[in-house]
Amino acid sequence: MTISSTTVKNSYSGNGTLDTFNYTFKIFADADLQVIIRDATATETVKTLTTHYTVTGAGNANGGTIVFTAGNIPTATETVVIRRASPQTQAIDYIANDPFPAESHEEGLDRSMMAIQQLQEEVNRSIKLSRTNTMNSTEFTIGDTDRANKVFGFDSAGELVVTQELGTFR
């Protein structure tokens, strides 16, 4: 099987009655999904497999569905986010002098591609510098106590710094 889609996340609006939502990407096991509910105040809650929802379609290249259990159906003010969350492990073990295991080898390649896609989705949500940027300091070396109640800024050389508060803005 190939991984021909780059989709790793689906989002839907709840309505208080709909309990079934599609995910449109392959997973190998039910536990390879993360289901998050985002409410009207932007609070995110990760739901628990079998407690809050069940999964169908593991192993299907086109995805499947999640079904919320009774009492856990998303309301009209909630957003359902379904993300692939494959384990970041490698479980294939080749045995010396055995015939080449094409199926398990391809599964390993698929799992690697899934991990790459998950990482790319996270990178796509991060703050980035352009490819031609010449900024040298992209790390913060001061600890959390020294960063507390401060803002990101730029020094006279255009380098990233953590600076004092600006007026009454926090």
List where the protein language model places each region:
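Function-dense linear segments that define catalytic or interfacial modules
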Residues: 129-131
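N-terminal assembly/attachment segments of tailed bacteriophage virion structural proteins
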Residues: 1-110, 118, 122, 126, ...
